[in-house]
């Protein structure tokens, strides 16, 4: 979880009130933080705050914490208002960056009065967002510049590796390639762009370099001090919605210091946008849902008051609350998220504890017993069980399996691209297991009983997790018949008749793959794995496999 340092006096200046250390321990809970440490330095008291929410970068600075506490205490209420005026500054984005670092969004904040506290908070927030929310600058990197040294228009371009500028902290110029090799930040983050034909570069109309995203700012414009009055902010990354959110967090934090936000026109080849966009977001929730899950007897007015403490604009009609919330938040995905804010505003310490009353006795899930029986059968057939991860990625699920990419459930903020989606089928996981064990003796006969996650628009969560069985046999001489023998034995033990209908599937050899039909329903696939798939996984022996849904075979 993100940890960050703040000055007690700076927080109190932003809120307009003073508090004791004991009071601060409770107050920071409103901002989903805990007071991790307190120390004194040069006559000032500092806090180390431990944020308990990785989806709320707006709460990772003194400005964000102070803002939330002001609302929680009723000093302010409702939706925060931020005025954004156009600056008439334009940034042109090079089309050649689409496979390098495609998106950049920008803003100007004027009229700042920076001191050591506010400057350190700005830099700390920039770094925390890039490190945590931005996945060590892979997804989001932020640059802050002295706008008075910049001559618009500005160009975000794909540059030759031989271009030169003086990076931050250096007086002499270096080529972009040299920066990756010699500069501390180049060595730390160079892997993000090193294999690209061109490198990203942000320059102004006079050719002055602002930065080399996501590596380093220039010495000329990238050094911001307490004398800086007007700043230009750039945020680059791979997903437009993520860089937009990061920009919104930065500019609204500076607006809490009295900065005036100015928007920038950003021109891409196929579209253009004005950033930042601080249009409030909207959500609706049933008030009875909040009452039921919270266990609190709250009337409509009380719920409205609690939500206003959490920076919502609330309109209640016919048992529903229509909500508007700030554009620096992107964590509202379900009514439970609204409920959480209601409980934070109410105060968890104010909820009376109740002893749970269990009216029933627990017992095992019959379907889990069925899954265990399937496992026992597979072991009895001479197979070894493996347990692989539900998390995967599109390359494993589709490209390496020689099939077209389909829509699957993806992770919004993956810690790694390797674990960026939920698997749609299990066989790719078994192929990866076989690929990692080519040094072991053959034959290798493995199976897994596990979950596959599918998109289902009819469900509340738009997804459904289905239990499946996947079997893979690897070794010299294995054919379709060997896989079918195991399937025959399984169906016989379960008391089902089945048919196999020939099917074309990129993961299997043409003419040696089929759909598995039970009671007229397609429940899976069986076949000999295609040579291209074996090559993709560096497997040098034949593999035969099948995968089936288990629920159609379950009898209560």
Curated annotation (Swiss-Prot):
<feature type="binding site">
    <location>
        <position position="341"/>
    </location>
    <ligand>
        <name>Mg(2+)</name>
    </ligand>
</feature>
<dbReference type="GO" id="GO:0006432">
    <property type="term" value="P:phenylalanyl-tRNA aminoacylation"/>
</dbReference>
<keyword id="KW-0963">Cytoplasm</keyword>
<keyword id="KW-0067">ATP-binding</keyword>
<dbReference type="InterPro" id="IPR009061">
    <property type="entry name" value="DNA-bd_dom_put_sf"/>
</dbReference>
<comment type="subunit">
    <text>Tetramer of two alpha and two beta subunits.</text>
</comment>
<keyword id="KW-0547">Nucleotide-binding</keyword>
<dbReference type="GO" id="GO:0000287">
    <property type="term" value="F:magnesium ion binding"/>
</dbReference>
<protein>
    <recommendedName>
        <fullName>Phenylalanine--tRNA ligase beta subunit</fullName>
        <ecNumber>6.1.1.20</ecNumber>
    </recommendedName>
</protein>
<dbReference type="InterPro" id="IPR004531">
    <property type="entry name" value="Phe-tRNA-synth_IIc_bsu_arc_euk"/>
</dbReference>
<keyword id="KW-0648">Protein biosynthesis</keyword>
<dbReference type="InterPro" id="IPR005146">
    <property type="entry name" value="B3/B4_tRNA-bd"/>
</dbReference>
<comment type="similarity">
    <text>Belongs to the phenylalanyl-tRNA synthetase beta subunit family. Type 2 subfamily.</text>
</comment>
<dbReference type="Pfam" id="PF17759">
    <property type="entry name" value="tRNA_synthFbeta"/>
</dbReference>
<feature type="domain" description="B5">
    <location>
        <begin position="278"/>
        <end position="353"/>
    </location>
</feature>
<dbReference type="GO" id="GO:0009328">
    <property type="term" value="C:phenylalanine-tRNA ligase complex"/>
</dbReference>
<dbReference type="InterPro" id="IPR020825">
    <property type="entry name" value="Phe-tRNA_synthase-like_B3/B4"/>
</dbReference>
<feature type="binding site">
    <location>
        <position position="331"/>
    </location>
    <ligand>
        <name>Mg(2+)</name>
    </ligand>
</feature>
<dbReference type="Pfam" id="PF03484">
    <property type="entry name" value="B5"/>
</dbReference>
<feature type="binding site">
    <location>
        <position position="340"/>
    </location>
    <ligand>
        <name>Mg(2+)</name>
    </ligand>
</feature>
<keyword id="KW-0460">Magnesium</keyword>
<dbReference type="GO" id="GO:0005524">
    <property type="term" value="F:ATP binding"/>
</dbReference>
<dbReference type="GO" id="GO:0003723">
    <property type="term" value="F:RNA binding"/>
</dbReference>
<keyword id="KW-0479">Metal-binding</keyword>
<keyword id="KW-0436">Ligase</keyword>
<dbReference type="InterPro" id="IPR005147">
    <property type="entry name" value="tRNA_synthase_B5-dom"/>
</dbReference>
<dbReference type="InterPro" id="IPR041616">
    <property type="entry name" value="PheRS_beta_core"/>
</dbReference>
<dbReference type="GO" id="GO:0004826">
    <property type="term" value="F:phenylalanine-tRNA ligase activity"/>
</dbReference>
<dbReference type="Pfam" id="PF03483">
    <property type="entry name" value="B3_4"/>
</dbReference>
<dbReference type="InterPro" id="IPR022918">
    <property type="entry name" value="Phe_tRNA_ligase_beta2_arc"/>
</dbReference>
<keyword id="KW-0030">Aminoacyl-tRNA synthetase</keyword>
<dbReference type="InterPro" id="IPR045060">
    <property type="entry name" value="Phe-tRNA-ligase_IIc_bsu"/>
</dbReference>
<feature type="binding site">
    <location>
        <position position="337"/>
    </location>
    <ligand>
        <name>Mg(2+)</name>
    </ligand>
</feature>
<dbReference type="InterPro" id="IPR045864">
    <property type="entry name" value="aa-tRNA-synth_II/BPL/LPL"/>
</dbReference>
């Amino acid at each position: 979880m993100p940890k960050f340092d703040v000055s007690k006096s700076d927080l109190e200046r932003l809120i307009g009130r003073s508090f004791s250390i004991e009071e601060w321990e409770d107050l920071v809970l409103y901002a989903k933080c805990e007071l991790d440490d307190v120390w004194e330095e040069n006559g000032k008291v500092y806090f180390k705050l431990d944020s308990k929410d990785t989806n709320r970068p707006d709460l990772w600075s003194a400005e964000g914490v102070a803002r939330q506490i002001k609302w929680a205490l009723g000093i302010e209420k409702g939706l925060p208002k931020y005025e954004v005026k156009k600056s008439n500054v334009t940034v042109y984005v090079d089309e050649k960056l689409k496979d390098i670092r495609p998106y950049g969004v920008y803003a100007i904040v004027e009229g700042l009065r920076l001191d050591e506290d506010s400057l350190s908070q700005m830099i700390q927030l920039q770094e925390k967002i890039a490190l945590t929310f931005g996945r060590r600058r892979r997804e989001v990197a932020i640059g802050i510049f002295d706008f008075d040294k910049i001559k618009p228009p500005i160009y975000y371009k794909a540059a030759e590796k031989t271009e030169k500028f003086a990076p931050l902290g250096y007086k002499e110029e270096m080529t972009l390639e040299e920066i990756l090799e010699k500069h501390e930040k180049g060595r730390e983050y160079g892997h993000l762009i090193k294999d690209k034909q061109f490198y990203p570069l942000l320059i102004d109309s006079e050719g002055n370099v602002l930065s080399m995203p996501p590596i380093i700012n220039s010495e000329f414009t990238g050094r911001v001090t307490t004398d800086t009055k007007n700043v230009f902010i750039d945020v680059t990354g791979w997903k437009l919605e993520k860089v937009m959110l990061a920009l919104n967090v930065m500019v609204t934090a500076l607006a809490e210091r009295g900065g005036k936000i100015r928007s920038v026109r950003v021109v891409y080849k196929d579209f253009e946008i004005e950033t930042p966009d601080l249009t409030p977001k909207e959500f609706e929730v049933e008030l009875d849902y909040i009452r039921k899950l919270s266990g609190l007897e709250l009337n409509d007015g009380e719920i409205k008051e609690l939500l206003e403490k959490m920076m919502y604009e609330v309109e209640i009609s016919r048992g529903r609350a229509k909500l508007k919330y700030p554009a620096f938040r992107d964590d509202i995905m379900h009514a439970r998220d609204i409920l959480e804010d209601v409980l934070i505003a109410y105060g968890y310490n104010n909820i009376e504890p109740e002893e749970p009353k269990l009216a029933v006795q627990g017992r095992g899930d019959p379907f889990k017993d069925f899954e265990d029986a399937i496992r026992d059968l597979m072991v009895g057939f001479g197979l070894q069980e493996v347990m692989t991860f539900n998390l995967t990625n599109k390359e494993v699920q589709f490209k390496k399996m020689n099939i077209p990419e389909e829509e699957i459930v993806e992770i919004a903020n993956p810690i790694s691209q390797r674990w960026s989606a939920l698997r749609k089928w299990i066989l790719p996981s078994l192929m990866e297991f076989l690929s990692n064990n080519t040094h072991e003796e053959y034959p290798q006969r493995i199976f897994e009983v596990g979950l596959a996650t599918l998109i289902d628009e009819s469900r509340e969560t738009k997804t459904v997790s289905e239990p499946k069985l996947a079997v893979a046999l690897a070794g010299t001489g294995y054919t379709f018949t060997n896989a079918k023998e195991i399937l025959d034995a399984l169906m016989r033990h379960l008391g089902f008749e089945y048919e196999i209908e020939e099917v074309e599937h990129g993961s299997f050899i043409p003419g040696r793959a089929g759909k598995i039909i039970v009671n007229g329903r397609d429940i899976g696939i069986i076949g000999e794995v295609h040579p291209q798939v074996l090559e993709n996984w560096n497997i040098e022996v034949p593999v035969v496999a099948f995968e089936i849904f288990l629920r159609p075979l379950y009898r209560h």
